[in-house]
Amino acid sequence: MNAEKSPVNHNVDHEEIAKFEAVASRWWDLEGEFKPLHRINPLRLGYIAERAGGLFGKKVLDVGCGGGILAESMAREGATVTGLDMGFEPLQVAKLHALESGIQVDYVQETVEEHAAKHAGQYDVVTCMEMLEHVPDPQSVVRACAQLVKPGGDVFFSTLNRNGKSWLMAVVGAEYILRMVPKGTHDVKKFIKPAELLGWVDQTSLKERHMTGLHYNPITNSFKLGPGVDVNYMLHTQNK
């Protein structure tokens, strides 16, 4: 089975799915193409858990979960986690790794819009990390995430800002110079300015709570969260 056999939905980019299908078998290789995701996952998890007031006992949805790096880590925190992705191969890898790790995660192959039509208002926390820049209609994803979270629940987004610096750092630097991710992973035209993301959020029941930047230091080869959202950034919102 491949991505083309997945349920039909307008908000799917099969070329984007194919990129991740091609390298799915190496999703949990700590030195492979997804090494940056493994490196930043503790920061993402810590931010989500802190801003959401902990994850234990909460029902969590990870939108665009891929091979399950974040989904598994949230399950280890005591959350009941569902992972959504349209890539068949990444989900197979995620399911196998969860089985081998003794971690319970419910992985589902469908779009967030399809999931929202069936599970509106059912989640305490919804995460959508590094996914918005890979779909044709990111605003539709934001809208669906808002529909899925309970009143008072938390929704987290992370993506890349669209400007010259982000192109230099995320495309030229990360893909061609440092070779941290495969060439062609990112398309700067699909990057999203914070004002654009906040505009979409404002058209839903979500309210902005906090925004932070994710920064890479090539000298120390380390990542940190902090002020400045000119490249990678994370947004915490809450359902009104």
Curated annotation (Swiss-Prot):
Pathway participation: Cofactor biosynthesis; ubiquinone biosynthesis
Keyword Transferase listed: yes
Top class in the EC scheme: transferase
CDD domains: AdoMet_MTases
Leader sequence residues: none
Keyword S-adenosyl-L-methionine on entry: yes
Source taxon at top rank: Bacteria
UniProt GO BP: methylation
SUPFAM superfamilies: S-adenosyl-L-methionine-dependent methyltransferases
Keywords from the UniProt entry: Methyltransferase, S-adenosyl-L-methionine, Transferase, Ubiquinone biosynthesis
Known catalytic reactions: a 3-demethylubiquinol + S-adenosyl-L-methionine = a ubiquinol + S-adenosyl-L-homocysteine + H(+); a 3-(all-trans-polyprenyl)benzene-1,2-diol + S-adenosyl-L-methionine = a 2-methoxy-6-(all-trans-polyprenyl)phenol + S-adenosyl-L-homocysteine + H(+)
UniProt-annotated binding residues for S-adenosyl-L-methionine: R44, G64, D85, M129
Gene3D superfamilies in the record: Vaccinia Virus protein VP39 (3.40.50.150)
GO molecular function term, any single one: 2-polyprenyl-6-hydroxyphenol methylase activity
Record EC number: 2.1.1.222, 2.1.1.64
Function: O-methyltransferase that catalyzes the 2 O-methylation steps in the ubiquinone biosynthetic pathway.
Family as reported in the entry's similarity comment: Belongs to the methyltransferase superfamily. UbiG/COQ3 family.
Name used for this protein in its record: Ubiquinone biosynthesis O-methyltransferase
Gene from which this protein is expressed: ubiG
